[in-house]
């Protein structure tokens, strides 16, 4: 079960994890993606924001930028054993710089996400802000 105040919702999908992410701005889509990933991998339990890491990601367009951003989050989790909890994102065109806050993975029992996918990925501006759909391979 997830609180109503979250800016993302998990949608039904046959084999993977499908997430609808909302934000007032495109920056918020990326920031809320971090929260959605954190929520899933730690079963909705909070993750401390004890450390910060700076990441930079590029894409050829907005969907590829989001894909590469998620891929970088998964790299932090798998290779650096760093669990993201929130982010502060700066966008300039198809370039992203973010400070990712989180904690050491050893402090948590995590559910694995294998990879980001381009399947069903969509990012669009709506009347009420921005919305993205992402599917993660688990």
Question: Language-model segments: what does each one mean?
Answer:
Residues 2-138:
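N-terminal intrinsically disordered, cationic/polar leader segments
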């Amino acid at each position: 079960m997830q609180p109503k105040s979250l800016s993302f919702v998990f949608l039904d999908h046959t084999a993977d994890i499908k997430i609808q992410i909302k934000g007032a701005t495109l920056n918020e889509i990326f920031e809320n993606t971090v929260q959605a990933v954190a929520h899933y991998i730690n079963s909705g339990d909070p993750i401390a924001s004890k450390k910060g890491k700076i990441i930079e990601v590029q894409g050829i367009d907005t969907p590829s930028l989001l894909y590469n951003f998620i891929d970088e989050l998964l790299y932090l989790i798998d290779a650096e054993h760093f669990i993201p909890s929130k982010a502060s994102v700066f966008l300039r065109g198809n370039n992203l710089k973010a400070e990712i806050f989180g904690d050491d993975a050893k402090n948590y029992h995590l559910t694995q996400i294998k990879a980001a996918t381009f399947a069903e990925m969509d990012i669009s501006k709506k009347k009420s802000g921005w919305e993205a759909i992402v599917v993660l391979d688990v």
